[in-house]
A protein has these predicted regions:
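Conserved active-site "lid/cap" helical segment
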Residues: 1-44, 50-51
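Active-site-proximal alpha-helical scaffold in enzymes
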Residues: 15-26, 78, 82, 86-89, ...
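Solvent-exposed alpha-helices and their adjacent loops that cap or buttress functional pockets
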Residues: 32-36, 91-95, 120-122, 148-151, ...
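Active-site-proximal gating segment of KS-fold condensing enzymes and close homologs
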Residues: 43-101
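Short beta-strand segments
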Residues: 43-46, 103, 128-134, 176, ...
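Active-site-adjacent elements of ketosynthase-type condensing enzymes
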Residues: 52-53, 135-157, 191-197
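A glycine- and small-aliphatic-rich helix-loop capping segment at beta-alpha/alpha-beta transitions
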Residues: 55-67, 119-122, 142-153
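Condensing-enzyme catalytic core mediating Claisen C-C bond formation in acyl metabolism
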Residues: 154-197
Length: 197
């Protein structure tokens, strides 16, 4: 990561999670050097990208037109987060042959896992690093609040008196391969539907 580059909270959460996934994969499979030869796809799901930094910039710039660190806008879009993370993986010796961002709200990380599985099955990559990252920001909180679906109480999804959802932030990544060497689990299937009209 360039010293002049500004990292959003979404990117920082993602970098930590992808580093843990990669470290675990290397220790289980023993393929530290092999990652340079393997064709790796990086598929990352996120919705807000670097919106947290954009919000800070907007507030500073609104109050003083000369204010605000414009570098923070370099992390605004979801793709900027993925790009930063892909560069980090390359600095760790990972041979990234394909990288993309999936921004489908709550299903983004699941869609990244499905796409990575399909790419492995079609022989488009040898390893797929898949998952997602998102941080809380005013944009997300206000968006869900405007829908009037936030519950002010703790999460209770199966309770008859439930009154909405609770928002959180986090990141999680997996390393998928076609072989079972060092595998922790097996992905046996997936499903995806768009039930809107």
């Amino acid at each position: 990561m360039d010293r002049q580059e500004v990292a959003s909270r979404t990117a920082l959460l993602g970098l930590k999670a992808v580093d843990e996934a990669l470290t675990d994969f290397v220790s289980r499979s023993g393929k530290a050097d092999g990652l340079k030869q393997l064709r790796c796809a990086f598929l990352s799901g996120t919705s807000v990208g670097g919106m947290d930094l954009s919000e800070v910039f907007w507030q500073e710039h609104r109050d003083d037109l000369a204010g605000g660190d414009a570098r923070s806008l370099s992390m605004h879009t979801p793709g900027d987060v993925t790009s930063m993370m892909a560069h980090y993986l390359e600095s760790r010796g990972v041979n990234i042959v394909f990288s993309t961002t999936i921004s489908t709200a709550c299903s983004a990380a699941g869609n990244a896992i499905m796409l990575g599985s399909k790419m492995l099955r079609e022989g488009l990559c040898d390893v797929a690093i898949v998952g997602g990252t998102d941080s809380l920001c005013r944009f997300t909180m206000n968006g869900f609040n405007s829908l009037r679906i936030l519950d002010p109480e703790i999460c209770r999804p199966f309770d008859e008196s439930r009154a909405g959802l609770n928002l959180g932030e986090g990141a999680g990544y997996l390393v998928l391969t076609a072989d079972s060497e060092g595998a922790v689990c097996r992905l046996t299937g997936w499903g995806n539907a768009n039930e809107a009209y």
